[in-house]
């Protein structure tokens, strides 16, 4: 891959990761701050590029995780093993407790956001569009091979991004200190 394609991949990995951390996690899920329309759109595009479900679903699972951490209601319960917490939870049906407790979480704040309503409605279309964008930029601007642009700019970037995110679910809960309070969402 052209060095610019590698730089592009790193920048887009950082962008998607920041959108998950500062957007989906801090702003939307935990309501740590408010943002104007255009910053919300910017984060919505980045979270779509991260391919970790739409923000409403991501936030519901995360709120459930915080409320019932390391229990059967936790979507990525570390007590079910390191692999399960890392990525295995995505390969099996959700534990009945996850579904039961997920229904108890109030998501009306996020469901009222028109940016998130748009993302949820068109998510299945928006994800491939982000992959086209990630491939198009290297091909158009520095004449990268289409296959290389796709595999480095879209696929490798996604694999790195997902494993960085999943490491929080697995490594942080397996080896980290557990100061969380289940009364806080």
Predicted features, each with a name:
Residues 161-179:
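C-terminal accessory segments of proteins
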Residues 107-114, 175-185:
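Active-site-proximal inter-transmembrane loops
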Residues 1-166:
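Non-catalytic, topology-defining segments of multipass membrane proteins
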């Amino acid at each position: 891959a052209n060095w610019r394609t590698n730089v592009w991949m790193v920048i887009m990995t950082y962008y998607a990761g920041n959108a998950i951390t500062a957007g989906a996690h801090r702003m939307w899920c935990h309501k740590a701050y408010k943002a104007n329309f255009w910053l919300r759109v910017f984060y919505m595009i980045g979270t779509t590029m991260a391919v970790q479900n739409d923000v409403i679903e991501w936030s519901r699972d995360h709120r459930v995780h915080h409320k019932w951490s390391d229990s059967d209601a936790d979507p990525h319960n570390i007590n079910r093993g390191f692999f399960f917490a890392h990525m295995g939870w995505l390969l099996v049906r959700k534990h009945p407790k996850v579904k039961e407790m997920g229904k108890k979480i109030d998501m009306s704040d996020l469901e009222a956001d028109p940016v998130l309503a748009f993302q949820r409605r068109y998510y299945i279309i928006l994800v491939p569009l982000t992959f086209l964008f990630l491939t198009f930029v290297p091909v158009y601007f520095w004449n990268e091979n289409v296959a290389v642009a796709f595999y480095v700019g879209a696929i490798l970037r996604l694999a790195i991004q997902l494993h960085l995110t999943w490491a929080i679910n697995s490594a942080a809960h397996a080896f980290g200190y557990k100061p969380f309070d289940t009364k806080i969402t």
